[in-house]
Structures are given as structure tokens and as C-alpha cells.
């Protein structure tokens, strides 16, 4: 679980940075500033938990972030908050469902 969280946190930080650097036409995801900040903050938090957190904290993060990802996919389809701020694209929706379900499963199954 610790390794999965460390890798996932690194990917979140990378996605957050790339969102600020890549031109929107070349980005797979929306690149909205609020969305990039979201990825950076949760990536740093996940990395800190992977380094210094206990199993319960890591499990809570994985399940919680997975649930947030699943909510984001649903919010995008139903035009709920924060769709306007994050400006999701169809690729974001697919990633949110796949990553969200995987994180919840890893958090539950350990």
C-alpha cells in the first residue's frame, strides 16, 4: 500500500506541474489552474503519508481520494460543482473512474 501511494502521489505532483507547463492543445486533461493546484496539494499530502503515515492514514487517503475521483467523474457528467472550475474533458472522466475505483479497492483490500 505504501508503494502504491508513493507512486500515485508522484504522478499527482507530475500531473499538477505538467498542467501548468503544457499548452492546452497538447494536454490530455483540462489544465485548469484550480485542477493543477488540486493535484499538487493532494500529491504532496499523499507523498507525506507514504513516507511518514501509518497504515490507517494511507488507507484513509486512498479510499478518500478514490471517492473524490469517482465523484469528479459523476460531477462532470451531471454538471455538478466543481465542473466549471476544473473544466474536465472526456479523458478526465475515464481517468477518474479507473483511478477512483482502483484506489478505493486498494484502500479496502490493502
What are the residue ranges of the model-derived segments?
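Membrane-interface extramembranous regions
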Residues: 1-110
Amino acid at each position: 500500500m505504501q508503494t502504491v501511494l508513493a507512486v500515485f502521489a508522484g504522478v499527482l505532483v507530475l500531473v499538477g506541474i505538467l498542467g501548468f507547463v503544457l499548452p492546452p492543445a497538447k494536454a490530455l486533461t483540462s489544465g485548469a489552474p484550480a485542477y493543477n493546484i488540486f493535484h499538487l496539494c493532494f500529491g504532496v499530502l499523499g507523498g507525506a503519508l507514504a513516507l511518514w503515515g501509518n497504515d490507517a492514514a494511507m488507507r484513509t487517503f486512498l479510499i478518500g481520494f478514490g471517492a473524490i475521483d469517482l465523484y469528479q467523474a459523476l460531477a462532470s457528467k451531471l454538471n455538478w460543482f466543481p465542473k466549471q472550475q476544473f473544466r474536465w474533458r472526456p479523458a478526465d472522466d475515464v481517468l477518474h473512474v479507473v483511478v477512483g475505483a482502483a484506489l478505493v479497492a486498494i484502500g479496502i483490500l490493502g
